[in-house]
Amino acid sequence: MAADGYLPDWLEDTLSEGIRQWWKLKPGPPPPKPAERHKDDSRGLVLPGYKYLGPFNGLDKGEPVNAADAAALEHDKAYDRQLDSGDNPYLKYNHADAEFQERLKEDTSFGGNLGRAVFQAKKRVLEPLGLVEEPVKTAPGKKRPVEHSPVEPDSSSGTGKAGQQPARKRLNFGQTGDADSVPDPQPLGQPPAAPSGLGTNTMATGSGAPMADNNEGADGVGNSSGNWHCDSTWMGDRVITTSTRTWALPTYNNHLYKQISSQSGASNDNHYFGYSTPWGYFDFNRFHCHFSPRDWQRLINNNWGFRPKRLNFKLFNIQVKEVTQNDGTTTIANNLTSTVQVFTDSEYQLPYVLGSAHQGCLPPFPADVFMVPQYGYLTLNNGSQAVGRSSFYCLEYFPSQMLRTGNNFTFSYTFEDVPFHSSYAHSQSLDRLMNPLIDQYLYYLSRTNTPSGTTTQSGLQFSQAGASDIRDQSRNWLPGPCYRQQRVSKTSADNNNSEYSWTGATKYHLNGRDSLVNPGPAMASHKDDEEKFFPQSGVLIFGKQGSEKTNVDIEKVMITDEEEIRTTNPVATEQYGSVSTNLQRGNRQAATADVNTQGVLPGMVWQDRDVYLQGPIWAKIPHTDGHFHPSPLMGGFGLKHPPPQILIKNTPVPANPSTTFSAAKFASFITQYSTGQVSVEIEWELQKENSKRWNPEIQYTSNYNKSVNVDFTVDTNGVYSEPRPIGTRYLTRNLLLAAA
């Protein structure tokens, strides 16, 4: 403690230095101190786990680790430019700070929250001192003036609100894009604030933006409520894919629920019973809904694995259309007072149909417009009839958002932790893991009789196994399970000319019904040098663009090939092995038989089925007491709590009711459909390849043969096509490489 009337030495030194600097101060902003400049080789005060999130760090530390780190790098560059111009950004809240906060407004990570908080505090501290740039400097320049929002539809009369409404910003997906574009009020990953009276978790499972002047995403008829984004952002060990498509929703079943069942005369194996509903649902459970062919190429040629982490969903630019007929002329007009209803089944109360390889997903080509599929489901049946345990669901029993033209709907979801998909092939075989130069110290039974002159005598002999008898060596691991399939050739002359598509197929029996084992457990498609063969029901078969539904030729389908897993998995069309079937003795020789099915044994190791650009991303694991290695047999990630179903329907509007009362159910409605855009953003975690292999890898490429056509493009009629399936296993790893 300093004596009365005296200042402490440290405070005196600080004040003296400040007075000296003030005495020499020149007009204009103070010059930056040398220590304030970014140095390319400096670490600075960077948050652990980041490269740029923190002050005084260098600008050349490699790729940012995530979106917050990328925003920090852009912020550092902006500071560097200000320092070069003689401005000192550290002593005022400036446009770079505002843009940094804008980029992080969707980021809920620790680093993102901390970055926003620091610069919000900086702004609050400097505001009373007049050291905050004017808003005109803070906002990015616009390519055109932002018009005032036109009138919005009123809830009762259909007329607009009186007077000019404040201009609204547009959707910001959190991507680093055109600095001149108009920012959006409703980020894809940021649900709007909950209306008063609702809990804070009300919007966590999906929300509709209300018609209001509070920048919650609701826009009038004249303004779009979101922007189109189709791209991918690569950030070190992450990639964010964003897809936007245009959808159309008809009115299904004339707003009715209906029973559906198998037709009379159907075989017992084909009987079913269920319900169709007037609702549709959004299905984006295919990889090509999110990855372009080029992005898929980048993904599989540079990574050993990937898995989904987060998902953001948004419906926007919703338009309800009314169709009228007058003297043979069809008129389509906006209906500003009609609504659509949307909700997410976050509790999985409804039968879950996503992941069953249905049509109706977002199309792979962004320019194509798709129809929202109708929601229907099956329940327990006896033949074509219901039983006591059969369930029926009324979807109007669920709370839903009612949205009009100009509204939007958002939903955010976090994937459960799942293993990385193994996007690599093995460069070793499970039965060839040994050193061929060294014999084993273990022995094996090499002979059971001993030659003696011209006869043989019973006698046991043992040997150590080496390279010359590698088949006899002791091994730690067994190949995976087997459920044998019939072999089919792509060359018709190699096949029997009888009809065996059902009678010769591998099937399982459940509740008195047979079903194909299709595709069944992951097994290799064929042996070496037998590419023309494939298992009858053991592979995924995709249709080419324009293929008919039934009995199409082989040239119109795409047959996948799981040949890369034959290093660990049995070949589907071969026996698993052989097994002893008797007890040998003096007068009885040892006998064996083929093993065509083999369940799981201790010591088994195997690979799951590969995933394909055209294939599913996930499947819901059934809710049962027991399950074993629930990896979906069609490929993808097995999830106990997958992205919930998002359901939508056009709200019925009665058409010209009678002026006299009738107790009958109303069955006449105006003809309506709805349309708009849907955007889905998914963040994927990547497992970068870091092989020490010397010789070049096999990688996916489009120049696999000489062609005069461009793959994955449109034809002269504007029809987009995918000419072949693309899996993920081109890079290699050895079998015993440690997991990352």
Predicted regions and their residues:
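Extended terminal accessory/targeting regions
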Residues: A2-D154, R170, G177-D178
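Capsid-like jelly-roll
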Residues: A139-A740
